[in-house]
Amino acid sequence: MMITLRKLPLAVAVAAGVMSAQAMAVDFHGYARSGIGWTGSGGEQQCFQVTGAQSKYRLGNECETYAELKLGQEVWKEGDKSFYFDTNVAYSVNQQNDWESTDPAFREANVQGKNLIEWLPGSTIWAGKRFYQRHDVHMIDFYYWDISGPGAGIENIDLGFGKLSLAATRSTEAGGSYTFSSQNIYDEVKDTANDVFDVRLAGLQTNPDGVLELGVDYGRANTTDGYKLADGASKDGWMFTAEHTQSMLKGYNKFVVQYATDAMTTQGKGQARGSDGSSSFTEELPDGTKINYANKVINNNGDMWRILDHGAISLGDKWDLMYVGMYQNIDWDNNLGTEWWTVGVRPMYKWTPIMSTLLEVGYDNVKSQQTGDRNNQYKITLAQQWQAGDSIWSRPAIRIFATYAKWDEKWGYIKDGDNISRYAAATNSGISTNSRGDSDEWTFGAQMEIWW
């Protein structure tokens, strides 16, 4: 009996410790990719993106080590009510050395409270920095609806026929035409706080296994007292989105139509900008002080249309497929817009449940509104892959690859500069008038990719 009494407090203590550890368990999620590559003509791996496009086909075409490390925890729960704390720190380096220092990006720090409002069961209120309901095309790493940033909102309000979400976020624009110049201190400039107000209605049943999501985003400059917008900067804009998702073939197809105006056209994903983001100009104030507005051309007034179809499906036990097709037209009053269309496929053949071969073929074509010239590029990658499962989404994965790219460009390339600016054909400013010409290249290497 004495032995039993001695063991009982110990057992209770151990059990309590285990239960406490479970209750306080920290969730660890994230994403990472890294590898090594070479270029056929010599040197480290090059990556290929057509000048003027906002993205590139990514398989065998990523030249950096990148990671997002997420730590989160449910810190309080009572019945169906709870608070969850979430964080995310991101890192990116050039993968050229053992020791590569970098400043981390603190991308998320937010608290989400579920079922806290009695008369809105199922809803979540939140505040802080957050990846907010992002919509993207994985195979080209393209985010077409993304208002992420510091903000607050309420989501998943059940209306019976769909779920309503409301949010406000901020995306500060530094050093450009949305920068204010002080009316009182002429040598002082200030970054611009651009606010976005987002309304989404999701889960609208349209057909068997098909749902519709509708969204409206309004972005504007939030001016600081005593400062003014640079002359010609776009003050605000709208973006409208309709996305239909069809569940099919053990996967999905998404069809998207978007329209944006003025400040919402530069990034085209729901965040406001007051400029087109390509050039630079210097303003000389009355006292002789010169202020350089770097990497911006003011006045992105105009509109943008985007039609997008993408998905991932299974074509039987041995085949999976990713695909994308998109047309985008940015028509600006300053004549520096672009017309971009892209199409690509990534079939996967599964030799075993953990080994596969992938082939990615992608084509981009971008027309300069100013010059009327076109840049085009196609990229082909063949990869042998070992992954944790038999799906095209299975990760972690280790792959060896060979990539071939061929391009023919006639506008907008800055040698040794930022060759992905879609507004680089600013011939009236005397910059960005060259092109990559007509050439090709191939690369090969190995890469790991993981999310968890």
UniProtKB/Swiss-Prot annotation:
Q: Which gene encodes it?
A: lamB
Q: What is this protein called?
A: Maltoporin
* Catalysed transformations (reactions): beta-maltose(in) = beta-maltose(out)
Q: Give the positions of the site Greasy slide, important in sugar transport.
A: Y31, Y66, W99, Y252, W393, W451
> Top-down, what is the taxonomic lineage of the species of origin?
Bacteria, Pseudomonadati, Pseudomonadota, Gammaproteobacteria, Enterobacterales
Gene induction: By maltose.
The family database entries (CDD domains) matched by this protein are listed as:
Maltoporin-like
Which residues lie in coiled coils? none
**Cystine connections:** C47-C63
What are the TM regions of this chain, as residue ranges? Answer: 27-35, 65-78, 81-93, 105-115, 123-130, 149-159, 162-173, 192-205, 210-222, 235-248, 251-263, 301-315, 318-333, 337-351, 354-369, 373-388, 396-410, 437-451
Instruction: Give the protein family.
Output: Belongs to the porin LamB (TC 1.B.3) family.
State the compartments where it is located. Cell outer membrane
- Intervals, Extracellular compartment: 36-64, 94-104, 131-148, 174-191, 223-234, 264-300, 334-336, 370-372, 411-436
Residues in compartment: Periplasmic: 26, 79-80, 116-122, 160-161, 206-209, 249-250, 316-317, 352-353, 389-395, 452
Is Membrane one of the keywords? yes
HAMAP family in alphabetical order:
LamB
Look up the record and report any one GO term of the cellular component aspect: pore complex
* Residues making up the signal peptide according to the UniProt record: 1-25
- List the molecular function annotations (GO) for this entry: maltodextrin transmembrane transporter activity; maltose transporting porin activity
Organism of provenance = Salmonella typhi
What is its membrane topology? Multi-pass membrane protein
